[in-house]
Amino acid sequence: MTTPFARFDDRARRSSWLVWGTAVGVYFLALLHRASLGVAGPDAVARLDISATELGAFVMVQLGLYALMQVPAGLAIDRWGARRVLLVATLVMGSAQILFAVATSYPVALAARALLGVGDAAVFIAVLRIAAMWFPHRQYALLTMATSLVGAAGNLAATVPLVVVLDEFGWTRTFAITGATSLVYGLLLLRPAVSAPFRETAPSASEETGTEPSEGDPPARPAPRKPSVRETVANVPASWRRPETRLGFWTHQATMVTGVVVSLVWGFPYLTEGLGYSSAAAASQLSVYVVALLVFSLFIGPLAGRKPTWRTPMGLLAALACAGAIATLALWPGGRPPGSVVTAVFVIIAMGGPASQIGFHLARDYNPAVRISTATGLVNAGGFTGAMVTAIVVGVVLDISSGGTAATLTDYRWALGAMALLAVGSTVAMFGSLLGVRTLVLERMARGERVIVRVTEHWWDRLYRRVRPPGR
């Protein structure tokens, strides 16, 4: 006999939106945990008696392991599925936050942030995997945007609300509560869902070459069996060989690094120690960043989905704007920009978060479904590798400039200058990769092949071919 509860459970198990909603809840928690050190940085310095370099090392280790685990996480999702990986990730993140709550020494706290980076690594690409497998292709841009919005909400919760909770309950109880929340939420992931309606298939000839399918292409073959470990590992070089995957890697790095480094670790100390803001005012400024990120997500995500030809120009514009905004803070006469300028800079760098999603569109469109998670992991690694390097460089520059004493505004200007230079370097790499991809697309079009996104030849394409001829 079928009970009403059983019928409800069956409908719920078949709901694509319920599956995505459960998964994106993990992403909300992941962003809350990831950004929690942003406003707790000064408290960490006082509690653990650490320097600016050691504070930067928290982010370096957390983001470094996050970046390092991107490819293994993608392989695990391709091999065992998103639900199992999300369950493990949720439990690991919760345990890491509880360990961070009780840490009273720097090594223990560092180990906790490292564990958090490992748990966090798989969450976003698992949610994107669910979006790709549970929804039709036309809804992918919408789901990517919605995922970013939920993540931004988690980031927002790690600003003013977290400051209030820290002031009210203190370090230990605050981080213990957030960790316990993740552990309890993991219970929702114990029940497996039915098979995804848009399951992965083996790649067709057109998927392997990055062209649109032609009438003579055989249809993609169903791949009901789980890929072997060898086949899964082989996805890594196969994904990286795609020039569009490499373009996604650099796009993600060039657009997102400044926002991540500012929001996760160095924005709050710059505002409080460098510009003399109160903790509440600095947290409010970070909230402006998150709100701007939410607003930009409403526009950039849909545009990237509906206007494929606009994707890389939008990404390049966002990367240049972010680098220029950070340079403005570093080079402002006297070093103390007015509040309106600081707010404008935080709004501009928020553009990079939604723009970084363009890298995932490239991974999604130019890799067969059996490699989506691996390619997405490679793209995601680009941004967080850059963020790791930038965070530690800022800390080192601060320590060198300040001589180990309390950092001044001048010290922060040097550090921001270093951040701007690194952002420019990533943008140059993105532009070079973009020119290479455009050259390949123009060659395919000249041969009469159909391509996923058509391009129009410009003078810079001809100049690039002269400087770096095809085949080199």
Language model features by range: what are they?
Residues L68-P107:
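Conserved MFS/SLC helix-loop-helix module at the cytosolic interface between two early adjacent transmembrane helices
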Residues A146-F198:
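Helix-loop-helix hairpin linking two adjacent transmembrane segments in secondary transporters
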Residues T2-A12, A196-F249, G448-R468:
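Juxtamembrane intracellular "pre-TM" segments in multi-pass secondary transporters
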